Each structure stands twice: as structure tokens, then as C-alpha cells.
Amino acid sequence: MSFTIYDLIHQKIFPDTKLVAGHMGCHHEIRWVNLVEILDAPDSIQPEELLFTTGFVFQNEEKFQHLIPLLASHRVSGMVIQLGYYLDSVPAYMISRANDLYFPILTIPKNITFSEVLHTMMQILFSDTHTGWSDSDL
């Protein structure tokens, strides 16, 4: 059984999660999660990964406009940006590119820790219903 961006949103896995761009990509399957802050080695990003970031890398609009198309071309499932550290909202250039490419961008509030994100997502992705592994295997 697969787990998708749609599932993440509609099962309310993380409170106050918002889909802000790339709505047409909600069917993208999530097979893994990756916490990233510096995307200087995009070849280390795998297809069907859901990226979590504080948005540090996106502060410099001109330098990083190419990242959304690059991530979409690598078949990344989508990106979740934790607002409140480096970004208070998702920049318009990111929303526009993500919508054009059906690349989902979601936001979570600052009070949801990456530790909580990893624990919850690993439970989901490695649950008996998804892969045959159980929580005790983690």
C-alpha cells in the first residue's frame, strides 16, 4: 500500500499542515523522508522522497530559483517547509514554479519538531500496512 501527499494532508498527520502549492501533485507517493538544509548535492536526493526543511536555502531567491525544477526532475515527492525560522511564508517564485510543475509544497508550524516529523513518518512508512515492517524494527 502506498502513502501519498494526499494521505499526509487528509489524515492530518501533522496539525496545521497546509498545502500551499503543487496541488495537482497530491498523488505523489512518499517512500522516504529527508531533512535537508543545504541542497548543494542534488544527486543525493532520491525519487519519492519527501523533503523537510526550515527554508534556510531559499532565503536567496536569485541563487536558488532552479531548485524547484531540479527537485521535480528528480521525482522528489514534495517539500515541507517549517515556517518561522528562516521563512515566514513560502516565496511567490517557489509557489509559481511548484504549481507549474505539480510539485507539492506544504508548510508546518515551528512548534512541530523535526524529531517528531521523523518519528511519525518512519512509523507510517515502516508500518505493517505499508512495508511489512513494524515499529519495533525501527
Regions found by a protein language model. Give the residues of each.
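Alpha-helical/coil-rich non-catalytic "connector" segments in signaling and regulatory proteins
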Residues: 1-138
